[in-house]
Every structure is written in C-alpha cells, then in structure tokens.
C-alpha cells in the first residue's frame, strides 16, 4: 500500500483478533426497565461481552413517561427512563465494573450519564474502573435523525462539556461515538457515511480545542459507529479506509503524533434498512454477510440485527440467534486465527484506495463550504427530511 509509515502503523491491526476477539455487543431495550433488565441478564448469560442500551423516543427527547408528549411512544423503540431509580432497576444484578456499557443517547446524554454515575457511586464503584461509551453525537441528530432539543450551538457546548467531564473523571470511558450508522440508514452512500462522520469528528475536536480541552487525550476517548450494508466488498474496504482517513486527520490536521490517538476504534451494526418484512428467514443470510464484513474490516465490537427487526423489536429467541451468528464466526470459521486475511486482495486494496480518495475529497468539500455546523444551520445536509429506503419500502 502507498501509505506513509505513520498512517500505515495505525492502518494495520498487528494482532487483529488473535489475542482478543471483538466485543459482541447486542443492542437492546424495550417496554420497561424490568423487562429490559431481564433481557440484559439473558444476553450476558448467553455470552455477550458488552451491553448496549436502547432508549425510547421520549427519553431521547427529554420527556418523562407521564408527559402527554410521550403518549404512544413509551417503551416502543427502547427502554423508558425518567428517574435515577429507573437506571438502578435497569442494571439490577449487573456488575458495572465487569461489563462494558454503550448508551445510545445524544440530546439527553448528560442526564443519562449523570444517572449512571450516581448509581455507580451508590454501589461503591470507582469511576476510573467503569468502561463504556456514550454516543453523545448531536451533530448527526441534525443530519440524519432529528431527535435534538436545543439549537446547534448550545447543543455542541453540552457535548463538549461531556468531553471535559469524562476526560477528568472517566478515563476508561469513550465520551463520544461519532456515528455514521444513522447517516447510512437515512439514505446516504458509503462515501457520504464516512465523509459526514469524519467531518462531524473534526467539528467536535475543533470545539473541544476552542474550549481548552486536551484534544490529544480526547482522541483516545473517541470511538466511531458504522453501518455494515449490503455490498460486502465495499463495506470491508470502507472499514479499512476509515482507519487510514482518521489517522491522517489526527496527524495532519491536528498535528497529533501519538499513535494511540490516531487509532480509529469503531463499533459496527448490521444494516436495519436492508431487512425485509417478507420472508424474514432471508434476513439471517443478510446479517451473517454483514457481520462477516465487519469482522474482516477489523471492528472492535459488533451488533447483529435479529431477523424479525423489519417487523418489530427482536424477540428473545431471535436476539439470541443473532448473537449466535457472531459466535459461529468467532469460534467455528477459523477467521480470527489470521491477521487481515483478505488484505492482499487487489480488489480490496483498489476499493480501499478509491474510497479513501473520494471520502477525503468529500470532507474537503464540506469544510470548504463552512463546515458541518454551518451546513446544518443553512439546511444543506439534512438527510432525515427525506424518507429512508426502509420507510419507502414499508
């Protein structure tokens, strides 16, 4: 590969999965805190190595469950959380120091993180032993989802305040997971997914730098969240390209030479928009290929969708079957024994180079137009205003 030695060092994963498998982190949350807690306990018993909490829309938008605005949405797309006591019940019988936790929350991220920290302190845990990730990616809410509360400037300030708190108090916590997943689900291409994700990340680093935060340290607490879509080889190449692009951004734009800061650590979820409501058994084949692409792309953690998610939240049986897909790849395929097994493929290398070039050009275009914050303010990059492919199909 024609890369500089610094970028090449972080592009490659020296051991890949030989010494440590990816985290099998199944996204879950529904109905009530007690039912969600039972699902988490079941998943942990079945072998997941990390939990990922889905919150319902009222929680995402800052409404209590008894608010009139919450009517019809309570527990529908995730677990409803209104009080610190709800968080306490949600993690009943779960050792917070032994489980890495991902919280998919953005507009109300500071509130939910405060609830979780309060619980940890109540149970006597040391904050520096807590491991987890807060999504905290407000920019993509304006671009792809629409679940924001405040105007963009104060919202970005809240996000930046969380960076500072986590840097000082939660050293093993990722203070943001910059998310391309939702951008892809809203109808973007693979190129746009990476370009807007990294343009958002640049905006966050610039905001943190302006606030006096140590961005070299911050880059070690940034993770990413990508989509694994239907084009198998494109997705593998996309994940590989992401590592190289991020390394160059950190090193060349922000002049950070620390190799750890240049690492692109990312979670992958299979593409919900590719699932069909008809012949749902075929969805298992789809998610298997998408999970395999994530593995060959070197993901740090993976969520595999249940085959019934085109119809509803996954049943416990289908959630378990989805987890088993990852476990079969991990323990029965032999793939983890090899480092970057398709890395020398001319197809993959050419696609990786092509994606890297196109994404870099797109990022430059976004920045030349004033950056993400300006494009959001003038309505240039709002994807959620258009129906996604899944919405059109339904």
PLM features: residue spans?
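Catalytic alpha/beta active-site cores
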Residues: 1, 5-229, 234-235, 253-256, ...
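Append "with occasional cross-activation on large, charged helical scaffolds in nucleic-acid assemblies
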Residues: 275-277, 300, 373, 380
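Active-site proximal loops enriched in glycine and acidic residues that flank catalytic Cys/His/Asp
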Residues: 55, 180, 226-228, 268-270, ...
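Single conserved hydrophobic/aromatic residue that forms the stacking wall/gate
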Residues: 2-7, 11, 384-394
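Short glycine/threonine-rich loop-to-helix capping motif typified by GTGT followed
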Residues: 112, 187-195, 229-241, 270-284, ...
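Catalytic-core signal marking the mid-to-C-terminal active-site face
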Residues: 320-386
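Flexible glycine/proline-rich, aromatic-decorated loop/lid segments
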Residues: 258-269, 278-305, 315-335
């Amino acid at each position: 590969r024609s890369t500089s030695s610094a970028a090449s060092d972080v592009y490659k994963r020296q051991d890949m999965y030989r010494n440590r498998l990816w985290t099998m982190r199944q996204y879950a949350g529904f109905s009530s805190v007690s039912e969600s807690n039972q699902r988490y306990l079941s998943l942990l018993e079945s072998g997941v190595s990390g939990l990922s909490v889905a919150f319902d829309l009222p929680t995402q938008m800052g409404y209590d469950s008894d608010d009139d605005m919450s009517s019809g949405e309570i527990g529908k797309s995730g677990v409803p959380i209104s009080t610190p006591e709800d968080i306490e019940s949600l993690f009943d019988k779960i050792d917070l120091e032994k489980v890495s936790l991902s919280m998919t929350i953005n507009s109300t991220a500071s509130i939910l993180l405060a609830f979780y920290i309060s619980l940890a302190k109540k149970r006597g845990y040391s904050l520096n032993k807590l491991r987890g990730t807060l999504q905290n990616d407000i920019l993509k809410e304006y671009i792809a989802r629409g679940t924001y509360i405040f105007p963009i400037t104060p919202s970005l300030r809240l996000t930046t305040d969380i960076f500072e708190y986590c840097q000082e108090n939660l050293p093993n916590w990722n203070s943001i997971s910059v998310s391309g997943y939702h951008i892809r689900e809203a109808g973007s291409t693979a190129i746009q997914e990476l370009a807007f994700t990294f343009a958002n990340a640049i905006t966050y680093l610039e905001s943190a730098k302006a606030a006096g935060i140590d961005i070299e340290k911050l880059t070690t607490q940034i993770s990413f969240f990508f989509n694994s879509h239907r084009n198998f080889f494109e997705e593998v190449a996309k994940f590989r390209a992401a590592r190289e692009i991020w390394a160059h951004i950190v090193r060349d734009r922000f002049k950070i030479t620390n190799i750890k800061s240049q690492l692109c650590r990312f979670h992958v979820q299979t593409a919900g928009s590719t699932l069909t409501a008809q012949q749902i058994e075929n969805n298992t084949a789809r998610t298997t290929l998408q999970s395999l692409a994530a593995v060959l792309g070197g993901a740090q953690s993976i969520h595999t969708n249940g085959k019934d998610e085109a119809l509803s939240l996954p049943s416990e049986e289908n959630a378990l079957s989805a987890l088993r897909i990852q476990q079969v790849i991990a323990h029965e395929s032999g793939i983890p024994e090899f480092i970057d097994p398709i890395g020398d493929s001319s197809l993959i290398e050419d696609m990786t180079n092509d994606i890297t070039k196109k994404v870099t050009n797109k990022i430059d275009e976004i920045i030349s137009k004033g950056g993400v914050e300006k494009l959001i303010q003038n309505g240039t990059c709002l994807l959620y205003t258009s129906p996604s492919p899944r919405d059109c199909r339904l």
